[in-house]
């Protein structure tokens, strides 16, 4: 393991006219960009990744920390996407133990509410088939109430238990980047792409600037890949003004583990809009999430949770555990988006 790219040294060489020509330049230091860099190096390309903040600064460090096999895709009838997601989950479990680990999910049933036990059994059987292991099972009320103390027993009809995975998302990005760099790739953080270079109307490189606001450096590449996530339109609009990205925000709230200690994931449908809600353990805390709303604020500013989102998540939790002390703003350890 050689460590990460020496950015000061590489930038200095670029300013002196070295390392200006690349086969592939990847813009964006999240999991998508990191994965592309690794695959580019595996194919033998001279490849460089550029990130304007720190690696995994955006969505790739602010996820729900789950590697799911696309259960909701299956429920929506998208068999192909579900199969692909499940197989990728299994691959990550095999290749990144300690970063990606299996965890049990419990989807609760209530009388008269959809989906019921039979529907979920069918869905989960297909789900497990794609994974190559049948491990879903029915969990009765007794076991469920032992695992999730204070759960509302009104119309409760047990739960389906199935396996998905949790991930340390930011560390996974760093692992993939490290693999890429060990294989001869390069990655620069705190280096902003200020503009795209065009030759005969085609992108032929980028103009970059270090975080110290020094002079611009022009880099050439026949292939420039936009892996900037929510920022993709901003970069792409240099050559195409069409808007394709709809920024969304999913927020979580975090409470002390002592307030609600769990070791598995409980999932249920919100009483208001029937969206899926998860309660799960993470790094010695308990997390409740997530919301799903349009993010209309400046994406360069750190996103934050709104009071309405906090109320939504508090209502979700308290509706399931009415006999417990109601969780309120005073119990929150953090608000995450």
Model regions and ranges:
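Glycine-rich FAD pyrophosphate-binding loop
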Residues: 42-60
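Dinucleotide-binding Rossmann-like beta1-alpha1 core, especially the glycine-rich loop
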Residues: 65-147, 277
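Extreme N-terminal leader/targeting segments of oxidoreductases
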Residues: 1-23, 39-42
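Flavin (FAD/FMN) cofactor-binding and adjacent substrate-gating region
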Residues: 109-188, 196-202, 283, 323
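Conserved small/polar residues in nucleotide/adenosyl-binding loops
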Residues: 330-337
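N-terminal Rossmann-like FAD-binding beta1-loop-alpha1 element of flavoenzymes
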Residues: 24-48
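Flavin (primarily FAD) binding-site architecture
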Residues: 226-239
